[in-house]
Curated annotation (Swiss-Prot):
Pfam families: RexA. May confer an overall protective ability to the host cell by triggering a growth arrest and avoiding lethal host gene expression. Additionally, may confer symbiotic protection to the lysogenic host against secondary infection. InterPro entries: RexA. This is Protein rexA.
Length: 279
């Protein structure tokens, strides 16, 4: 999963007036009744993992929602029940810190648009003309920045199933009957030997004039850096970090760690993109 960072606020007058939505307060006000929301044929519901992290789930099984709302099952029990039968529902994870959030989505989990629908559907207070905004924070790391990286280590290349090379890679591995609708993507990890710099290889891939990948993340140092930092490059340049944990507690801990590690970048992006938000 990828933990993407977003700004949350309400706006009017074409974005000139911006106010905080106090997301943490609003979500916690819903939890006592285990509120869910029907959107079309799907149901959205939210449960708390810890003080800042929430499990946000989409399902089309009304009986599951009723069962969860009547039970005292932990979010771990809920997530495990979804994992046992993937047709029941799909989770995403939400980390809230002030007017910014971390949002990690499984393949079919609810999106940030679903979160917007949920907030509005559950009665978030909006004045006339106001809109809820969940805006991706865009980082400054670009291909040009890579040229100035002092050291590049482990590099992960994402190849989406829609790309022609996806099937070629599976065939090299021995697959013969490839049904495209079954797959989302492949992650190819290029792992160097201990303390070896693979900057040349990483740059060749990044600057490939005919790219056969969608996203790249890499562990790198810039010219002034003394530690390896995770850099995530995509067409949109969305500020984000990969998550590799399994349990809810691990995911919550990792999302908090990602936020703390990238806080300066997050706040800088927020200041540059959004500016001042009124209480």
């Amino acid at each position: 999963m990828k933990n993407g960072f977003y700004a949350t606020y309400r706006s009017k007058n074409k974005g000139k007036d911006k106010r905080s939505i106090n997301l943490s307060v609003f979500l916690n006000s819903l939890l006592a009744d285990n509120h869910h929301l029907q959107v079309g044929s799907n149901y959205l519901y939210i449960h708390k993992i810890d003080g800042k992290t929430f499990l946000f789930t989409k399902t089309n099984d009304k009986s599951l929602v009723q069962k969860i709302n009547r039970s005292k099952a932990s979010v771990e029990d809920i997530k495990n029940s979804l994992a046992d039968d993937e047709s029941l529902g799909f989770p995403s994870f939400l980390f809230v810190e002030g007017d910014t959030i971390g949002f990690a989505r499984t393949v079919f989990g609810p999106t940030t648009s679903d979160l917007t629908d949920f907030l509005i559907g559950k009665g978030m207070s909006l004045s006339s003309g106001e809109r809820v905004q969940i805006e991706p924070l865009m980082r400054g790391t670009t291909k040009d920045d890579v040229m100035h990286m002092h050291f590049i280590g482990r590099t992960t290349v994402k190849v989406e199933a829609k790309l022609p090379v996806f099937g070629d890679i599976l065939k090299v591995l021995g697959a013969t009957d490839i049904e495209g609708e079954l797959f989302d993507s492949l992650d190819i990890v290029i792992k160097p030997k201990f303390k070896r710099d693979i900057k040349k290889v990483a740059k060749d891939i990044i600057f490939n004039p005919s790219p056969q990948f969608s996203d790249i993340s890499l562990r790198a140092k810039d010219e002034a850096g003394d530690i390896l930092t995770e850099h995530y490059l995509s067409e949109k340049g969305h500020l984000s970090a990969p998550l590799n944990k399994v349990t809810n507690a691990e995911i919550a801990e990792e999302m908090a760690y990602c936020y703390a590690r990238m806080k300066s970048d997050i706040l800088e992006c927020f200041k540059r993109q959004v500016g001042k938000v009124k209480d």
